């Protein structure tokens, strides 16, 4: 049950892979592995090619081969320590490997090179939340929303933090803003309705469920929400 919500890393991968990443992902792992094998063969003849190493790292990430991706990105940043794509990728990969301090350093170095960069600020805020640097995380996401007040992604990220922390009324507001800014994303509505049901705001929750049905979500996929509403007094 997912709408076409923006996903920063996926968009970056698509750019690096020349628009072929999504199509190959739909074909399955075999196509991805074939592309990775080809990239590896070509790299043998051009070991200092940063572009090829970034593309190979992108395939590794698509296949969730985090250690292989990190090795490639280390080589990219050895060749060019200020490579923006390399820092962004490696921060993501380090986070997947639970190397949180290294990921944080990559994001911070990225922000030195591109101050105010949306992706880096968002990544750093979410990393801080995951690593229990809660004050830094919330300060970071608040700052991001001040800089990018029209970003549905930023509001949804803050809503997710607030939901995890039990700040439910604030989370309802932020997911509502995300829905207002991006009316195509089912995930925002799903989180919003979940919060409304928890808070006992039944009328608004039913409005959200009707909205999801209008967006093409089948009634059967919403049964759990309807059941929770029926149990609410």
Provide a role label for each language-model segment.
Residues 41-42, 75-76, 109-110, 143-144, ...:
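Canonical positions in the second alpha-helix
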Residues 50-51, 84-85, 118-119, 152-153, ...:
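Helix-start (N-cap) detector for alpha-helical repeat units in TPR-like alpha-solenoids
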Residues 30-34, 198-233:
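Terminal, low-structured helical/coil segments at or just beyond the last alpha-helical repeat
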Residues 61, 88-95, 129, 156, ...:
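Position-specific recognition of the canonical hydrophobic site in helix A of tetratricopeptide repeat
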Residues 21-71:
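N-terminal leader/linker segments that initiate helical-solenoid repeat arrays
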